[in-house]
């Protein structure tokens, strides 16, 4: 049965939402090509202009090319410009990634600025990635979902990403995501930076930043797992190891492996591996069904000190997620060897930690994620259409973000339900939140009216800031009638029927035109498609319903069903008292 996904009035993450709000606020009409037929930026997002010396193309991942850049906010006053066409700033650029570099014409890049810069509102740094996400068929939402969950589960640090359009050497390259790189830094992975070739016993205990890797091309150490498979650890910090450092890292990973494959009732493992961060990290991989996690792009870090533990994180690559309905753990029955994940899942203490964290973080999680993704899609949809046009000859792009949004939201709803069932966590009663956004001053009689098959009809009044209404019900279906406060006895809104409500649902009432006189203006519930506002009030004292489905309204104290051709049926008389 089709599920309605609706906007939440809950606050989104302050670190992410402003970029989306500004992008949609300054959206312009799509202009795909210029007069000479060349595809141009959409004008709805900031544009990063990069020019290499002599226009040399970026062809490898090993050698930085000298270049310049400037960032044009495209009229968005919330974003700081860096450089200009006349006075660009110095930059170095090279390729990055593995499959995403080899498999697609739309390439990802690594940037190294000449000096630290707080690009697109992110923490100032010299090091950023430009991720192309050419391998993401789900509306560029894979990393967006993974990073959202990481922040929600409060992992110590989560990379930030911001949408931007890229013009490289005068060629429009489409929609990219400027992303913070995983590095040892006070604003990223905040641990002591261990020097290369260190030999001192105390110093080689940390800090360490390593990656469980599925490629053996980078400097690494390798051990044989308890199941006979080889596991590779690429070290990021330090970058060049002494004999002592190599021995320390190898011994540490070997000890973890021995304990992970050892007695599942023992608690000794948790003396060396942080169980809280592991559980938070694990939940992100499980909910997104990231079957490549614990196989590649899987980071661990350790602070300096003999008593310090290893921590899983930060999250990074979600390029294989959100594909099919969630029916099994991410580490079972997959093509990749997920190293330690299956063994870790067998520890009762770890399962208890997963359940405790899920009980803590799952309420309203999916409702908030729905709202976040809605804002995300609205911010990039015009640029995504340009991107799809730019790369259509290559057979990739995301031209239908609304369809992608439906898929991702459905996937995450199903995954959350699957996780609740697996951990034995009973979801809370669904809460229906009604939010008004009037254009003019409304009276205190603004309200909503709810009723169902097994509940008595009642009014719902404000509980927060005078504009937010909350009503909790398990009655299915539940009907909601939104009532205009100024003219509440003579006009109202359409009714929404909710089927199979299992999550918190939120409805936002939009005033499309000023309500300067009775029976004028448009009011509707903003739901998933959000594309049409139906006007039921264009004839004085006679409601006109042009929809195929009857609409319930409040008129002169009576609850009416408005049929086609302006006929109605009286359901009953209502009082303005609760």
Residue spans of the language-model regions?
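C-terminal outer-membrane/trafficking sorting elements
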Residues: 534-578
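Insoluble glucan recognition modules
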Residues: 428-537
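Middle-to-C-terminal accessory/interaction subdomains
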Residues: 45, 56-58, 89, 100, ...
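C-terminal segment of classical bacterial N-terminal signal peptides
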Residues: 13-24
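A conserved helix-loop-beta module that forms one wall/lid of the active-site cleft
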Residues: 138-169
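Internal "kinase-insert"/substrate-recognition segments embedded within catalytic cores
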Residues: 116-118, 127, 132-134, 154-159, ...
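Positively charged n-region of N-terminal signal peptides that target proteins for export
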Residues: 1-4
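Conserved NTP-binding catalytic cores of kinases and kinase-like/nucleotidyltransferase enzymes
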Residues: 26-145
């Amino acid at each position: 049965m089709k599920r309605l996904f609706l906007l939440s009035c809950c606050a989104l993450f302050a670190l992410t939402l402003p970029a989306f709000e500004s992008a949609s606020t300054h959206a312009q009409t799509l202009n795909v090509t210029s007069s000479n037929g060349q595809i141009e930026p959409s004008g709805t997002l900031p544009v990063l202009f990069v020019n290499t010396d002599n226009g040399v193309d970026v062809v490898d991942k090993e050698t930085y090319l000298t270049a310049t850049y400037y960032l044009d906010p495209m009229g968005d006053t919330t974003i700081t410009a860096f450089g200009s066409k006349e006075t660009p700033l110095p930059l170095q650029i090279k390729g990055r990634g593995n499959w995403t570099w080899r498999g697609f014409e739309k390439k990802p890049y690594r940037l190294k600025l000449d000096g630290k810069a707080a690009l697109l509102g992110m923490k100032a740094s010299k090091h950023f990635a430009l991720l192309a996400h050419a391998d993401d068929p789900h509306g560029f939402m894979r990393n967006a979902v993974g990073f959202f969950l990481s922040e929600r589960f409060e992992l110590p640090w989560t990379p930030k990403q911001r949408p931007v359009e890229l013009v490289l050497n005068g060629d429009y390259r489409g929609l990219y995501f400027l992303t913070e790189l995983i590095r040892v830094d006070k604003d990223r992975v905040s641990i002591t930076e261990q020097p290369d070739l260190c030999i001192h016993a105390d110093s080689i205990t940390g800090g360490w930043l390593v990656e469980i890797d599925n490629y053996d091309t980078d400097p690494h150490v390798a051990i044989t797992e308890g199941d006979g498979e080889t596991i590779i650890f690429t070290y990021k910090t330090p970058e060049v190891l002494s004999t002592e450092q190599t021995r320390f890292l190898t011994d540490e990973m070997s000890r973890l492996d021995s304990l992970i494959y050892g007695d599942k009732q023992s608690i000794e493992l948790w003396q060396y591996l942080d169980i809280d961060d592991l559980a938070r990290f694990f939940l992100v991989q499980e909910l997104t069904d990231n079957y490549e996690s614990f196989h590649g792009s899987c980071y661990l870090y350790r602070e300096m000190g003999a008593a310090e533990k290893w921590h899983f994180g930060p999250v990074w690559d979600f390029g294989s997620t959100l594909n099919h309905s969630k029916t099994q753990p991410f580490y079972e029955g997959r093509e990749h060897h997920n190293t330690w994940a299956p063994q870790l899942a067998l520890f009762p203490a770890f399962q208890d930690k997963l359940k405790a964290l899920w009980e803590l973080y799952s309420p309203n999680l999916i409702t908030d994620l729905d709202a976040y993704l809605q804002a995300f899609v609205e911010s990039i949809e015009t640029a995504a259409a340009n991107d799809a046009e730019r790369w259509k000859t290559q057979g990739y792009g995301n031209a239908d973000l609304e369809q992608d949004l439906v898929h991702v939201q459905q996937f995450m709803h199903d995954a959350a339900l699957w996780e609740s069932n697996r951990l034995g966590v009973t979801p809370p009663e669904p809460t229906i939140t009604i939010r008004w956004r009037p254009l003019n001053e409304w009276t205190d009689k603004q309200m909503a009216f709810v009723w169902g098959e097994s509940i008595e009809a009642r009014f719902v009044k404000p509980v927060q800031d005078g504009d937010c209404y909350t009503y909790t019900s398990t009655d299915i279906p539940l009907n909601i009638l939104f009532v205009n406060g100024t003219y509440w006895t003579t006009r109202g809104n359409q009714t929404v029927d909710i089927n199979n409500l299992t999550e918190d649902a939120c409805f936002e009432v939009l005033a499309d035109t000023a309500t300067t006189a009775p029976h004028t203006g448009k009011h509707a519930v903003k739901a998933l498609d959000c594309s049409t506002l139906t006007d039921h009030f264009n004839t004085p004292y006679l409601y006109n319903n042009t929809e195929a489905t009857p609409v319930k309204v409040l008129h002169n104290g009576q609850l009416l069903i408005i049929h086609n051709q302006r006929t109605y049926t009286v359901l009953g008389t209502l009082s303005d008292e609760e």
